[in-house]
UniProtKB/Swiss-Prot annotation:
One of its GO terms (biological process) is ergosterol biosynthetic process. Its EC number is 1.1.1.270. The active site is at 180 (proton donor), 203 (proton donor), 207 (lowers pka of active site tyr). It comes from the Eukaryota. It catalyses: a 3beta-hydroxysteroid + NADP(+) = a 3-oxosteroid + NADPH + H(+). This is 3-keto-steroid reductase. The gene is ERG27. Belongs to the short-chain dehydrogenases/reductases (SDR) family. ERG27 subfamily. Gene3D superfamilies: NAD(P)-binding Rossmann-like Domain.
Amino acid sequence: MLICHQCLSSRLTYISNLGLNIAYRLIEQFTDDSKLVIVVTSRTLPRVREVVDLIKTYAEKCGKSGAVDFDYLLVDFTDMVSVLGAAYELEKRYDAIHYFYANAAQGVYSGIDWLGATKAVLRDPLDAVTNPTYKIQRVGVKSRDGLGLVFQANVFGPYYLIRRIIPLLAKGKAKVVWLSSLMSDVKYLSLEDVELLRTDSSYEGSKRLVDLLHLATYKELKSLGIHQYVTHPGIFTSHSFYQYLNFFTYYGMLFLFYLARWLGSPWHNIQGYKGANAPIYVATLANPTFEHQALKYGSATYRDGMEYIAKHEIDPTGMHDAYKYIRDLAEEWDIKLKDQITIGRSLS
């Protein structure tokens, strides 16, 4: 167990841009006599404060305010110096981490192809709201580090942080949970464009990389006592596209989601709370002796909204090449950040 600055026996949960519903369900599931410390991360302090206030209110509602404590960490996964700084802060503050959620979901969207969306809905409404290929994504967007922005935010940044804090995760016998997507098909990733700079499906490609990265690393982590899983939340309403919807299109989307569920789609969870089912299941309920880590665990619902866990096989095509690229890139950044490491140590 972790001894934190409050001198209480604690379990530390590191939340990487984690959706509130996952935090809520984690609080509900936590029944240990020890204290749960939730580390909220964001790029900005106002967002951290907002999230902490919401989680505190929920903990009080559940009657667990005394069992939950909070810390925060400012980190930008599209800035490698920031990622390195986050690793050092965690090393300074804590002895162990018990849960790590890698939930980055950066996209470079610029709108919706309404003509394409209309045609898709008329042609096959169920497929249109399950595989929405009419979202417009910008091509070639780089971070200030010169890397593909979506690749760095969703894949490389979180991977690099995990890699730097392996000792903390090992001490806590941690559960590392990656959030992938229902739309992480093989077709969205070209091994000639691992940084996703030449594709108009960079978000989906990044989630395909998450699947492959998990397959390539979970066995090595398991040998260190760290159990890693990959999950997806199904389909639910989120704030990411509200700016492109008006009153009519929002409720039209909601109607189609419920219609899809009624027609038999297991993936239209609709509420974010239900979408959080699989990420919580693998962290708190799954038995690592029996659960297969090579599978993807998805949040699913029956027609009546009853929740269940659905398991997927993951196509390993390209796993070794993708992992080699990411691993080699991490080693390059070790060298680039060498001076930052020296500076960080001299100031600590």
